[in-house]
Amino acid sequence: MSTEPKCPFHHTAGSGTSNKDWWPNQINLNILHRHSSLSDPMDKDFNYAEAFKQLDLAAVKRDLHALMTTSQDWWPADFGHYGGLFIRMAWHSAGTYRIADGRGGAGGGQQRFAPLNSWPDNANLDKARRLLWPIKQKYGRNISWADLLILTGNVALESMGFKTFGYAGGRPDTWEPDDVYWGSEKIWLELSGGPNSRYSGNRELENPLAAVQMGLIYVNPEGPDGNPDPVAAARDIRETFARMAMNDEETVALIAGGHTFGKTHGAGPASSVGPEPEAAALEQQGLGWQSTFGTGKGKDAITSGLEVTWTSTPTKWSNDFFKHLFSYEWELTKSPAGAHQWVAKDAEAVIPDAFDPSKKHRPTMLTTDLALRFDPEYEKISRRFYEHPDQFADAFARAWFKLTHRDMGPRSRYLGPDVPAEELLWQDPVPAVDHPLIDEADIAALKAKVLASGLSVSQLVSTAWASASTFRGSDKRGGANGARIRLAPQKDWEVNRPAELAAVLETLEGVRKAFNDAQTGGKRVSLADLIVLAGAAGVEQAAKNAGVAVTVPFAPGRTDASQEQTDVHAMAVLEPVADGFRNYLKRKFKTPAEALLVDKAQLLTLTAPEMTVLVGGMRVLGTNVGDPKHGVFTERPGTLTNDFFVNLLDMRTEWKPASADNDVFEGRDRATGELKWTGTRVDLVFGSHSQLRALAEVYGSADAQQKFVHDFVAAWNKVMNLDRFDLV
């Protein structure tokens, strides 16, 4: 018998087999409770925007300029300048952004956390962040990691002679990883033919993904699945960059501009490289990819496995990238690490060595670089940029600014003296308020007019929800401000029931015009404000019908955007393909409807209780799109009761599938078999899922009516104001 002592802490909290291991298909409510105050070390009254305003940004930039050329022995700078490394760091911080759901991007400084800190494509960026630590330490809470990573990329460009378009701070840090779907693969860089491939059919990339392989930011620089075919690579580039909100011109500018600087690293075999940061030994203190090849750094560094320097001036802005791209013919070769790359035929050695000034190399390129020459559309743009360097510089400056600010939302969130004055269409601009706002007396009068207009509670609530619920907490886009629900493309979305929406908006516009025409002091109400106010009036009336007097908070200040201020193509990605709050599915998806509800709730920054109370309220207010009966578990539609929960939890009702795919269910009286209700997966999950049932029981209790109404109003008000950054 063994006498070895047993560890008394073998069963520590969080260890062992998890619920997810036992029931992998169970919906994940944890995504609704990320980034709470429980994980935030800052004081409760800490306001990052105010802290950033106290920052001496010029001093930070001076320190960053000095850092660029202060090479450290533990990680030496290529060519004596860290610019290329820091550009890559900033690019990869922002480059995870994808337009399909707005997730990823530079906001929050997620590059510090798993899995991003350990993606193969982010190899050795841990060193870049450690180089920055003395500056972050010096300025502390006045600049977030999220802002510092992007600022450093900007300063890197400026220190090498490039004039940037501008810079905005305003990205508060997060303190734990986002819960983002990055793909189903279980192996880093798994090829497209793998068992969990993100591709189907004719290389159709799964939504909402944008990168071509697990662990890459964009595309495989060697070509699709490592196949060195520049034309095939162009297809991947175009698809991936489009999914990251970039058109062809922006794509060419970004690739060529970024590859004007620095180099890649592939001095030796990948077998010499140790584990990534999350798998590295404790004593490495969060650093990964420790290499045993030579010195493991400097001339011996291994990152991507590619060994390419694009220009003869890797620490200075130039047009060399295009000069080399078009001046040479290219032959396929391999890096010292064995990766596919290209070298200029019959070329002189004009490229400096990163560490030995006596050495020169022939120009080299990546497969994805050559795509800019051999794809017909990219070639036209590349040649124009080659012939017109000023156009190239302007395009790169604008594309870099877009890349690094795309997930920040409206300009009202931009902070600092370097914010550019120019308003850009992709920022979803709205006009500034240029008139007196309505007061409490006006608000009461407008509510009365709306309620007397003939519009139903359902119409008022549905329209306000449709307007506000486009908001995405991921990239801060959408929301009620701008009243874009009256513009293309939103006015034509199926989920908004265009014909009924047009009639509602026409009525509300009549109320708005009558009010504005009656004013003598310039006071006006915008349609954006009136839509939200009308929704508040509907909720108050529905609560009154239930015997509960309540006032829905309302803060005027929204304005109406024009069609010219609206990028129809960019706005189209906000169209809901699923909105469980309205019991809407555009089509059948592999992902269950209840999981899509949770995903929508997470984009709306809702907690599980807020999601629960909103669904229960929306059902009894009759806001369904499609079948008006599913989930409307009440005999009093239009009345804000807790009937949804009471009737869902009633054990006298037996539920059975009513469709072959188990998407619709019938609830029948257990004793008589009489049909009482019909519901969807979204409805029934509140009785099936143990956590959601616990919440439903709170609102389904006999003493819950008052609490239900007040909680609904609070959650409703939150959604209506998600885009009101001016109120924060």
Curated annotation (Swiss-Prot):
Gene3D superfamilies from the UniProt entry: 1.10.520.10, Peroxidase, domain 2
The entry's keywords: Heme, Hydrogen peroxide, Iron, Metal-binding, Oxidoreductase, Peroxidase
A Pfam family annotated for this UniProt entry: peroxidase
InterPro entries the record matches: Catalase_peroxidase (IPR000763), Haem_peroxidase (IPR002016), Haem_peroxidase_sf (IPR010255), Peroxidases_AS (IPR019794), Peroxidases_heam-ligand_BS (IPR019793)
Example of a GO MF term: metal ion binding
Domain of life: Bacteria
Needed co-factor(s): heme b
Site residues by UniProt (Transition state stabilizer): 88
Record-listed E.C. numbers: 1.11.1.21
Cellular component terms per the entry's GO annotation: cytosol
GO biological process: cellular response to hydrogen peroxide; hydrogen peroxide catabolic process
Subunit structure: Homodimer or homotetramer.
Protein name, as recorded: Catalase-peroxidase
Chain's gene name: katG
